Amino acid sequence: DVAPSRGLGDVYKRQPLGQILALPGTPLTRQLINKMKLYKVGSISIQNPSYAAAPQAGENTAKRDKVKPVPKTRAHEMVTNIQRVQASEEFRGFQLKYITCINQIKDTFGKICAGEKSFDEATLLTAVIDLSSSCGTTIETFDMLYNMRTIADPLYSHCLNVGLITRMIGRWLHMEKTDVNTLTIAGVLHDIGKCKIPDDVLNKPDKLTDEEFALIKKHPQFGFDLIRDLQIDSRIKRTALMHHERCDGSGYPSQLDSSLIDDFAMITAIADVYDAMTAARRYRAPLCPFAVISSFESEGFTKYNTKFLLLFLKKLATTYQSNRVMLNDSRFCNIVMLNPHELSRPIVRFDDGSILDLSTNREFFIKSVM
């Protein structure tokens, strides 16, 4: 809670370059508070009144002590990217379309699980394409998806997110339009088999028992069985069955090697893991994109298709070029150059102009993207 008549630091409204809602030192009026509520600004940095107290009536301001500068604190720095995204008109439009898609997916899953032998693929695809088109740039897409985590049921939001990410990958691969659309639906339907898993197992807050984990691992087969007889592209069916297979044969349910795994399933596997790792889990906070890139770099090239994974990681890392980040020692800096051989460890520049190559200074790493 805040009260009027205090000073504050920058408050941004998310636009392509960021629009300032209020400059540092602006008096915090009731009108401004209401404006920030409208833009869903979750927190602000408040100046200590001793730094910028208003002059009293009749006071000779010329003789007044020079106002001390407002110290730039971590609170000032961390007007978070989440707040900037959620403050935007674009986000509110995206949010409405996202919820429309979620309802469409929920309805589709319900009908398929009830035994219906067809679904309105065209309407579902149109809704997802409309949502995808409203995102703009790649970074805006990832920003928007991150901010939708708590809006809908985790299963349906995950399926939608994976559909959107697979769609981006398909376009990066310069696939034919019809193939991109099929890949999108494959991403959306990939986890439909989880509808057959009891909620108390699927959403269990504690560690799963061996029996429960074995049941979870059956969801690809459950999903394939649900859509086997639908009049849809066979690649969608294989994606539901194979998205947990891995190129080295370590996946499930059939321990297939790379020669037997459908390309759409391999693309969906990458999107699936990325979305899962950047989501909060009961045992950890959501990982930042560079932590996910690091994880893929350390073990991903034996498990995932190298062509698809390299493309995804390069595009993802490039998305954050010039972005402001925080290191594990709480210092803030900007990414100035990517290391092509280790994308998770770019070269960064601090506010004093000094440069740090994270690939050669391995005690430091990117902890969060601002």
Model-flagged regions — what are they?
Residues P69-A214, I227-L230:
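Acidic/His-rich, divalent-metal-binding segments that scaffold phosphate/diphosphate chemistry
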Residues V162, T182-I197, A214-L310, T318-Y320, ...:
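Alpha-helical scaffolding flanking metal-ion-dependent phosphate/phosphodiester catalytic sites
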Residues R331-P340:
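Short beta-strand-centered aromatic/proline hotspots
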Residues D1-L8, Y12:
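Single conserved hydrophobic/aromatic residue that forms the stacking wall/gate
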Residues L343-I355:
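Basic/aromatic-rich interaction segments and small domains that mediate binding to polyanionic partners
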Residues S354-M370:
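Glycine- and charge-enriched low-complexity intrinsically disordered segments
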